[in-house]
Regions:
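Feature captures the FAD/FMN-dependent oxidoreductase FAD-binding
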Residues: 72, 135, 140-144, 196-244, ...
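FAD-site-proximal beta/loop scaffold in flavoenzymes
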Residues: 248-279, 363-437
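Ferredoxin-type iron-sulfur electron-transfer modules in oxidoreductases and energy-metabolism complexes
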Residues: 17-36, 56-89, 106-133, 262-263
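Rossmann-like dinucleotide-binding cores of NAD(P)H-dependent redox enzymes
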Residues: 163-166, 170-201, 206-207, 295-341
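N-terminal Rossmann-like FAD-binding beta1-loop-alpha1 element of flavoenzymes
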Residues: 140-165, 291-299
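Residue-level detector of alpha-helix initiation sites
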Residues: 82, 147-149, 172, 288-290, ...
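Glycine-rich dinucleotide-binding loop and its adjacent helix/turn
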Residues: 119-135, 192-214, 239-301, 408-418, ...
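A conserved FAD-binding loop/helix module that cradles the flavin
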Residues: 433-459
Length: 460
């Protein structure tokens, strides 16, 4: 075995998967996982752990995989992570744990994410649950939002002995895991629902269809319902648009709405009561993971799909793996291109999009080179659907109905990065509601930090 080269992971064939919503990556079997784990040199001062936002003891769990002790490996992971089967699939490991791996200096880094996924899937298939609390604290904590931040915070607090209730605005728990990430990347029934069941097995209660700020306020939860502390993990669900002419035309969607229709409402299924527009030629404006998800969803619904992004491929914020999969499946990348107007017919339906070519100038405040228009390079793309994937911001409903809870100019809740503490006594926050749209694992890290902060607050 070549220890410098990682064990390849099996995937659905690109042509076949472009026509279905089944999971693309098939993961490792036990033999492959043990072989990959055997490449790990078990560093004493493991940099991979420092690269993990939830600080999983990576060398320890990989050692147990190498020895064939998969259940023990799972318990090591679940001490730190409430959602290992999710993280193993959607975390940007290449820039976090795997990006710090010593093996990667000369050769391939250890496939930490694929090993985490294998362990979590094995545990699920064998009915193994995470270890729960040994003693109860007798105090109630409310968690707002059942996405990655909320589930992580709730799981950690339940393990610490608190009586935790999650309040979810939608009819189904999971947050962005169920409405934002497609089935072909993250199966809902086989993976997400089972991870949520694991959190519930710790004693966490989940109430759906509860909109905090309408159904009940944070002050009412604390003053009338007996909750000693509240964690806000409500995410960032308000889509951003470009503000160009024609954006209100029929056939223009936010990626948020488009993906929610497909993922949560199962609109890709012809029998679904919630329709989705099956465009023939679709442009997705943006270059992040959400743009890739929307583009690959539209492709599976039968469209010719173009990614329109104003910078070059090097600046694409999406994971390398997602870009690679999109290209394999036949999605066209129109880079250094920026929309200026959406064109519609007399009935208001999209027929095209005016664009201008761009070139890269000096770096901006983000460190990426600023795109500059190329004079005289305007052209029109013929389209029937445009999906805007330009990021999201938090819904101001909670902050506007909670006295003493301060936000910044982007309506993000102001919270201490170390412990999630907000400007309101007993109220903590983390994830996209604080940072704006970011990754699943960063939201989990924030939920974990807030759980520790709440425990310290309630232990005084």
């Amino acid at each position: 075995m070549d220890v410098l080269t990682k064990v390849p992971v099996r995937e659905q064939d690109a042509k076949e998967r472009a026509t279905n919503f089944k999971e693309v990556c098939l993961g490792y079997n036990e033999e492959e996982a043990v072989a990959e784990a055997s490449r790990c040199i078990n560093c004493k001062n493991a940099q991979c752990v420092k690269g993990c936002p939830v600080a999983i003891d990576i060398p320890a769990f990989i050692h147990e995989v190498k020895e064939g002790n998969i259940e023990k490996a799972y318990q090591i992971i679940s001490e730190s992570s409430a959602l290992p089967a999710v993280c193993g699939r959607v975390c940007p490991q290449e820039s976090q744990c795997e990006g710090k791996c010593i093996r990667g200096i000369k050769g391939d880094p250890i496939s930490i994410g694929k090993l985490e996924r294998f362990v979590a899937d094995w545990a699920r298939e064998n009915g193994i649950k995470p270890n729960g609390a040994t003693e109860k604290k007798g105090k109630k904590v409310a968690v707002i939002g059942s996405g990655p931040a909320g589930l992580t915070c709730a799981g950690d607090l339940a393990k610490a002995g608190y009586d935790v209730t999650i309040f979810e605005a939608l009819h189904e728990a999971g947050g962005v895991l169920v409405y934002g990430i497609p089935e072909f990347r993250l199966p809902k029934e086989a993976v997400v629902a089972k991870e949520i069941e694991n959190v519930k097995s710790l004693g966490v209660k989940i109430e759906t269809n509860v909109v905090i700020g309408k159904s009940v306020t944070i002050d009412e939860l604390m003053e009338k319902e007996g909750f000693s502390a509240v964690f806000i993990g409500s995410g960032a669900g308000l889509p951003k648009f470009m503000g160009i002419p024609g954006e209100n035309s029929n056939g223009v969607f936010s990626a948020n709405e488009y993906l929610t229709r497909s993922n949560l409402m199962k609109a890709f299924n012809p029998a679904s009561p919630t329709p989705i527009m099956r465009g023939k030629k679709v442009a997705v404006v943006g270059g992040g993971n959400v743009a890739m998800d929307a583009a690959r969803t539209a492709l599976r619904l039968g469209a010719e799909v173009h990614i329109v992004y104003r910078r070059s491929e090097e600046e694409l914020p999406a994971r390398v793996e997602e870009v690679h999969h999109a290209k394999e499946e036949g999605i066209i990348f129109d880079l250094l291109t920026n929309p200026t107007e959406i064109i519609a017919d007399e009935k208001g339906w999209v027929t095209g999009m005016k664009c201008i070519k761009m070139e890269l100038g000096e770096p901006d405040e983000s460190g990426r080179r600023r795109p500059v228009e190329v004079p005289g390079s305007e052209f029109v793309m013929e389209l029937d659907t445009v999906i805007m994937s330009l990021g999201t911001s938090p819904n101001p409903l909670i902050s506007s109905t909670t006295e003493g809870l301060e936000t910044n100019k982007w309506k993000c809740i102001i919270a201490d990065e170390e412990n999630g503490k907000t400007t309101k006594e007993g109220v903590y926050a983390g994830g996209d509601a604080v940072t704006g749209a970011a990754t699943v694992i960063l939201a989990m890290g924030a939920g974990k930090a807030a759980a520790k902060g709440i425990d310290e607050y309630l232990s005084k």
